[in-house]
Amino acid sequence: MQKLELLYEGKAKRIYRTEAADMVWVEYKDSATAFNGEKKATITGKGRLNNEITTLLFRKLQEVGIKTHFVEKLSDTEQLVKKVSIIPLEVVTRNVIAGSLSKRLGMEEGTALTTPIVEFYYKDDDLGDPLVTEDHIRLLNVATPEQVSVLRDAALQINQVMIEHFASCRVRLVDFKLEFGVTEEGEIILADEISPDTCRLWDETSNEKFDKDVFRRDLGNLTEAYEEILKRLGGASHV
């Protein structure tokens, strides 16, 4: 498989065409952003860590029958994935009150939820990726009610697998963001990535943060935090 021309460059990844019409080549970048791109930095090794962690987690999900776009890891920072049309919704599942939910509802960060909360955010940088209801989604015409139901059910299924998997590594899955895409056959599958960029991950005992909040809040060394997650997941740490 060959990497051909650049199709798209986002905040954290570059997407390239391949000679296969149904595959694209993903390259993870060493860039870190927060607050919708207002805070930026280049952090050596971050692309490798996100690629390694995403590979491990997507393989875990595939083992239990959850369909993803992941095909294979190509290098430390690259992977081959199925080409999909991304649904412009971020699907956020929350198990613990943190971040914007804490601010929005005035509830204490760290409070465990009795049942997970699923939220949808409209993917639009100019609008700041606003929180939307199912009625808003219908108005925007970005997904059908049936597709929204599929996204919610998939997010909750993935959440249960991930909670158990991270718990086995002594990590608390606080919340995480998923993106989904539609294949040429019309099937909705998990896309994008699952990494400390897209999850809040706390040590189960100390609540030490091992995610992008380390960068957002200037809490320490981001690569060391991500390396700790990779190590706990059984990956090859480069520390």
From Swiss-Prot:
Q: Which residues form a coiled coil?
A: none
Pathway info: Purine metabolism; IMP biosynthesis via de novo pathway; 5-amino-1-(5-phospho-D-ribosyl)imidazole-4-carboxamide from 5-amino-1-(5-phospho-D-ribosyl)imidazole-4-carboxylate: step 1/2
- Catalytic function, reaction form: 5-amino-1-(5-phospho-D-ribosyl)imidazole-4-carboxylate + L-aspartate + ATP = (2S)-2-[5-amino-1-(5-phospho-beta-D-ribosyl)imidazole-4-carboxamido]succinate + ADP + phosphate + 2 H(+)
Gene Ontology BP terms: 'de novo' IMP biosynthetic process; cobalamin biosynthetic process
Organism taxonomic ancestry: Bacteria, Bacillati, Bacillota, Bacilli, Bacillales
The terms under GO molecular function for this entry are:
ATP binding; phosphoribosylaminoimidazolesuccinocarboxamide synthase activity
Please give the organism.
Answer: Bacillus mycoides (strain KBAB4) (Bacillus weihenstephanensis)
Enzyme superclass (EC) = ligase
What EC number(s) does this enzyme carry? 6.3.2.6
- What NCBIfam families does the record tag this protein with? purC
The name this protein goes by in its record: Phosphoribosylaminoimidazole-succinocarboxamide synthase
Q: Which family does it belong to?
A: Belongs to the SAICAR synthetase family.
- Could you list this entry's UniProt keywords, alphabetically sorted: ATP-binding, Ligase, Nucleotide-binding, Purine biosynthesis
